[in-house]
């Protein structure tokens, strides 16, 4: 009888679903000012006996549980963006010199090409974290109520924002590590010797370029601050940390500081580009540089966020999310549905 009870308790434990994250709560019915703490249920009724297979999933449940279901969409999108960016960068950095001047730059693939893919994927995924919030606000303004359900694709997208953010942080950390490895590369040392030799041949005593120095100092500093804020967002998404925060504190960190990190990342990319926007040589085979494509979606998100932050729209959105309904728009939708 005891072994049967243990098996039953194990099945109950594996069938139970963990509590959702704070940002996955019913965002349509929760006020931002709520400060109540969410507690995990404590399973006191489970029989705690030591067994060798205590943490093994029962065989009948192994094929019924999905593997990381909320990570499927973010990983697929990240893989698609990374693959397309890699092929695009490979075409510009390696294939073009080989086809035009027969120069082989395949050594750039492991570090230089990959390090142009990583920031592109990171900032795009970070923009995809806050884009559904913009779309949801526009939908609520259009409907005039918060009680009408969002489309299924938007609802699914909003529930995977945490995963998009964690993947963005992962690619940002990789980008920082790859960037720090630049001076350790053998090819960089050879280039440094070549630059020194060319400076001697040109009789230049000083190779200091003022605007280039300022450019690098600024964009590196902004990149460090942006990565630090992303790290803070990643830490607060850990369940043990988020449980210690009120909903208002968690919402403030994830929404306000998240937009700040997106803004810093966008400025980081723009300052990295500096005067390359008007350089004809950057448009290889009439294709724009990678940084131009990378900042497009973040700029769109920031512009719409700024528009929705205007007092006339902000007040109406807050009223709708606190339960107010626009009767005129609701009546129009009811009449259209009846027709």
Curated annotation (Swiss-Prot):
TM helices/strands, residue ranges: 71-91, 119-139, 164-184, 218-238, 258-278, 291-311
Binding, heme b: 175, 268
InterPro entries per the UniProt record, alphabetical: Fe3_Rdtase_TM_dom (IPR013130), STEAP_metalloreductase (IPR051267)
An example molecular function term from Gene Ontology annotations: metal ion binding
Main location: membrane
Entry's localization field: Endosome membrane; Cell membrane
Keyword list, A-Z: Cell membrane, Endosome, FAD, Flavoprotein, Heme, Iron, Membrane, Metal-binding, Transmembrane, Transmembrane helix
Expressed in which tissues: Ubiquitously expressed. Highly expressed in prostate tumors.
Recorded topology in the membrane: Multi-pass membrane protein
Co-factor(s): FAD; heme b
GO cellular component: cell-cell junction; endosome; endosome membrane; membrane; plasma membrane
Binding-site residues, FAD: 140, 161, 237, 254
Domain Ferric oxidoreductase: 118-265
Function: Does not function as a metalloreductase due to the absence of binding sites for the electron-donating substrate NADPH. Promotes Fe(3+) reduction when fused to the NADPH-binding domain of STEAP4.
Assembly notes: Homotrimer.
Recorded family membership: Belongs to the STEAP family.
Protein name: STEAP1 protein
Gene name of the record: STEAP1
């Amino acid at each position: 009888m005891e072994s049967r009870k243990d098996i039953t308790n194990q099945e109950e434990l594996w069938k139970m679903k963990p509590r959702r994250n704070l940002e996955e709560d019913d965002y349509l019915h929760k006020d931002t000012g709520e400060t109540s703490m969410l507690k995990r249920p404590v399973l006191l009724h489970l029989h705690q006996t030591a067994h060798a297979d205590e943490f093994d999933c029962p065989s009948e449940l192994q094929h019924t549980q999905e593997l990381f279901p909320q990570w499927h969409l973010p990983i697929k999108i990240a893989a698609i963006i990374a693959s397309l960016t890699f092929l695009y960068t490979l075409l510009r950095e390696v294939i073009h010199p080989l086809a035009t001047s027969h120069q082989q730059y395949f050594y750039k693939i492991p570090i230089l090409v990959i390090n142009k893919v990583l920031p592109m994927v990171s900032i795009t995924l970070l923009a995809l974290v806050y884009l559904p919030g913009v779309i949801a606000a526009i939908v609520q303004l259009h409907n005039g109520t918060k009680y009408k359900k969002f489309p299924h694709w938007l609802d699914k997208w909003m529930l995977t924002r945490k995963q998009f953010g964690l993947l963005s942080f992962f690619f940002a950390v990789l980008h920082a590590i790859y960037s720090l490895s630049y001076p350790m590369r053998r090819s960089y040392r050879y280039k440094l010797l070549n630059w020194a030799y060319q400076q001697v041949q040109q009789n230049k005593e000083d190779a200091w370029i003022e605007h280039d120095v300022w450019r690098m100092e600024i964009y590196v500093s902004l990149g460090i601050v942006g990565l630090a804020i992303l790290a803070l967002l990643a830490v607060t998404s850990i369940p043990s940390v988020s449980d210690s925060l009120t909903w208002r504190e968690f919402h403030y960190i994830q929404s306000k500081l998240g937009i700040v990190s997106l803004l810093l990342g966008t400025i980081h990319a723009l300052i990295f580009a500096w005067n390359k926007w008007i350089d004809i040589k950057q448009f290889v085979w009439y294709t724009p540089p990678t940084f131009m494509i990378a900042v497009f979606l973040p700029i769109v998100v920031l512009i719409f966020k700024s528009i929705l932050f205007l007092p006339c729209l902000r007040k109406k959105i807050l009223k709708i999310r606190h339960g107010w309904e626009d009767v005129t728009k609701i009546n129009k939708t009811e009449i259209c549905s009846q027709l």
